[in-house]
Structure formats: structure tokens, C-alpha cells
Amino acid sequence: MKKQLKYCFFSLFVSLSSILSSCGSTTFVLANFESYISPLLLERVQEKHPLTFLTYPSNEKLINGFANNTYSVAVASTYAVSELIERDLLSPIDWSQFNLKKSSSSSDKVNNASDAKDLFIDSIKEISQQTKDSKNNELLHWAVPYFLQNLVFVYRGEKISELEQENVSWTDVIKAIVKHKDRFNDNRLVFIDDARTIFSLANIVNTNNNSADVNPKEDGIGYFTNVYESFQRLGLTKSNLDSIFVNSDSNIVINELASGRRQGGIVYNGDAVYAALGGDLRDELSEEQIPDGNNFHIVQPKISPVALDLLVINKQQSNFQKEAHEIIFDLALDGADQTKEQLIKTDEELGTDDEDFYLKGAMQNFSYVNYVSPLKVISDPSTGIVSSKKNNAEMKSKQMSTDQMTSEKEFDYYTETLKALLEKEDSAELNENEKKLVETIKKAYTIEKDSSIRWNQLVEKPISPLQRSNLSLSWLDFKLHWW
């Protein structure tokens, strides 16, 4: 899901148990999935606020961390937010504390969750609507959107014609993998080892997009087994493809796809983008391995699981409410009501060697994480920074000195590709294959769906303890027998 950290946050290491024993209502703890935040931004936040930063591997660990009062602020997926709401563990978001306007051209203040919708892309507005039986049916009342993502299929090498058609489904993808199995044999196909994510995908495949709901309808183990076996019924088995590489560490998955050691994989779109940029191995790849527009392809099926992660505040830590809102602003909302010109400003006076050192926290985080920002100013398909319809080169050049522009001529594939992605200066240095890749990346940042499907059908909701147990058992059994 995330990239390896490039910077060290702590000068010494302590055991997790000793960290936890020192945490609680007297210590502000910011918690997140590993490598799901810009290290430079985290350093800035730590300079302003004394806090402990911890990571967790799953939403279930996050929920436990809130229940035992360890975490003050954390990132949670939608279904985890729903569960935390039901367990009365969240403090409502006071949107007035952020001192935001509804847009850069508006003087109207954002005072509540309803006002806040104006800051976000359209998909967020629908996803934020919770089920009718929840305590409050507006997700934005309890949480601040952090990043949005959906599942895509990545493959290396020549294009597969069946996957270049419009309205490709996940069933089409699985059939294409099986048809072209010689490309993916010998452990060259990779899946994320996450029971819930793969179930969501399998459920869409199982219904052949007819119901297109990623959430389970039953709780028996036979039901979950049958859904997982939808892959087997289409021929996606280790007996047919020799073996399938399944790994829970998305960093490994990203780098395997970036290097070409794996020829295909099902990953989140942000991870696909980072792999397209070379992943953590970009400085080590040979010319033949480096992804470009001819050998790296991202397929976005028309109906695909969607994940929205949000920042939440622990209700039990009432003494940290002011700090919690300030930190959430720094991580996710700083720049949300600004113009694009303001959003892409950098601070050269700080003397950093990192070219992606943005003044606004939301832009700094986006430039590192590479997932879809929920903010309209960044991700709106017509007016956002990541848009093929606008050119930001002129606004960027106005902010740069002659010396800076000269120094940026020094070519680096990774930064040049990111510049082209954001339509900054010097994108002409990219060759045609690299420009094709940039267009592929831009498309990956646009998450769309079939008009007949509601966003909430594609977002995971809470499941019962029995469903969770049977889902996990069925997944383990399926992997053992078929993958």
C-alpha cells in the first residue's frame, strides 16, 4: 500500500511495548499505516507539536489502539470509521477550527460537514454518506478524507489487446491472464495478501458485475469459499499458472512490478503509479527494466473496489482536541482552499535537497504518497492539478529563479516524470515512451465507475465477527488449495 520511508524519524529504537506503556491520555500519538505519510511533512509536524508517531499493519489494530486509548489521531478506512462510530470512540470533527473557505474564490467559511463537501471531489460526497442505521449518516461529521484509491491491474511488456477495450471488467482481466498465462507463469503474477481486499474483488467477479457490491451478503464459511473460488472457476489457479505470488507487503509488490520480476499484479492505483515511476528501485534499474509507455500498462476495470482512508480523533483524549485539529489540518487540509499557484509553491529557503518540498502540507503529502487526493484543487478531473486540461508550467516558472530553473535541467527520470505528471517545467526532456507513461499515470489518478453503480457499493463496510472469522479461514484455505 505504501512506500518505504526515506528518512529516519527516531534517533534511537525502543520496543513497541515500552512505547505503548508510555502512551495514553498524557502523550499525543499520531498513528498511521506504514509509509503512508511524507517523511518531510511528518518532520514539520513534529517540529510544531510534541508527539509520538506509531504505525500499524491493519484497521483491526487501529481499532484496538483507539479502544485502549493508545492513539490520539489516526488514519482509518471507511469500514473502520463506521465501527469506531458505532463503538462511540470518535470525537466529531469541528470544521470551524480549520479556518477554511469553501474555495479559493469564495469568502464563505467552512463551518460544518455540509460546508466541507465543497472542498472535495464528487466521489467523496457520496462515499461520505453512511448507512441509515449509523449514529450520524454523514462520514465527514466524524472524519477528514486523507486519500482515495481503487484496485487496478498492472502488467509489463507488450499490450494485451483484450485489455485495451473500453469498459473492461475484472472478469475480462482474469480471463486475459489465463489466456496469456505464458506471460505470468512461474510466479510472475502477484496479488496483495489481504483477505478482505481479495474478497471484495472476488465478489465482483463472482457476480460478473451484476450486483457489483464488494460487501458480503451472508456469513457462512461455504458462502465465502464459493466467492473466493470464482477465481478458480475462471482458471486462475496454481495448477494452470504454475504458481501465484501472494504477498502482504505492498512495498515488495511495488518493487517487483517496477523491476519487471513480476509481469502482472493486482494493486491499488497509487501503488501502480509508484511502480510506474520505478518504485524504491528506480536508481538501480537497468534501461530495459525502467517502466515506460510501451512496457508498463495500468488497466482500470469499470467496476472495481474503492478504498477511502480518513483521519479520525479519539474521543477519550479530550485534552488534545485543539492539537488534533491542527495536526489533521497540516496533514490533509493545508492548501485545500488555495489556488493551484499557491498549492505548488516550494520553500527553497529551507535548503532541502528534496525537489518536492511544498509549502502546503496537502501537496507535500500527495507528492510523496502518490494516491488520489480527495481535494478538489488537486484531483478534480477538470480543474485540479492532476488534469490534462490545464497547464501549470507558466505558474511554476513565475515562482522559480533563473538559477533554480538551470539546476532543474539536470535530468532525473523520477522527478522529471513527476514534473510532467503535474505539468511543470522541462517535461519536454521526456521521450515519447515516457510521455505515454505519464498519460497512463494521469488516467490512473481518475477514479470512475459505471453510472448504474453507487460509490457505496464499491466501498467496504463493517462486517460481523463471524463474517470476519469465516472470511479469514476461507481465504487461507483458498490460498492453500488454489494459489
Curated annotation (Swiss-Prot):
Location(s) in or outside the cell: Cell membrane
Residues with lipidation of kind N-palmitoyl cysteine: 23
Gene3D superfamilies found in the cross-reference section: Periplasmic binding protein-like II
Pfam entry (one): Lipoprotein_8
InterPro entries registered for this protein in UniProt: Uncharacterised_lipoprot_MG045
First and last residue of the signal peptide: 1-22
Keyword terms, alphabetized: Cell membrane, Lipoprotein, Membrane, Palmitate, Signal
Name of this protein: Uncharacterized lipoprotein MG045
Organism of origin: Mycoplasma genitalium (strain ATCC 33530 / DSM 19775 / NCTC 10195 / G37) (Mycoplasmoides genitalium)
